[in-house]
Amino acid sequence: MLVGHDEKVPIARLLTFLEHGERLANECAKAQAALAPDSASRRFLLSQARQEAVHAVVFQGAIAWLAPKHLGDAPFLPALEEYRKILDEALARNDLLETLLAEQVILEGLGEAILTRIEEGLVKRAAPFGRLRRILLQQEESHHGFGRRMLERAMAEGRIDAETLRRRAQDYLALTDQMVLALSDLFESIAEDPTAWANDVRKFLPLWLREEEPSAVSNQPSAREAKELIAES
């Protein structure tokens, strides 16, 4: 695999973030299964929980291969912990619809956006395990699609409306923007634009949830730009 020596640690740290996201998704899907309205949804969520656990192990293996010294690192991302907190609060209220919005639609959308970008880079670098990577990405797409269908069915049945979902999504989307901002130095170290990654997250959202306002990331200078501004002042 043609990964530059100076790219290994940033990519490993990015995978560490994804690993922790997969563990959060695993815990959430198991809790959601207990709230599922029917046996088919329950089976899907339990299957998702198992898949998320496998994904976390896959990311661990990739981290161990790229930068073994960083295996077991905990990403310092207060936004991810805050995301976990408000998601747990929704689970405690038995609010299945909000948890589907937060986990399957928004968080899986973030993961899918990042994985899609990473996959493009890995293909260019002739990375191994292409079939495994494609399966992982397909499963993420399946989880995301499940959440969208569940919410669209709830809207069709009058149990919730798009305006309510957009309002509830605001805090979660703000936190995903903060996560990308916190990782911006990693993106730039592998010649990627964090603003483009943040905007990708919006592209994976359903039309009824997208906001016309640009994400917070697009209004922020990049880490490199910030350093240049400081140097000039």
Which positions does each model-derived feature cover?
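Non-heme di-metal
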Residues: M1-E225
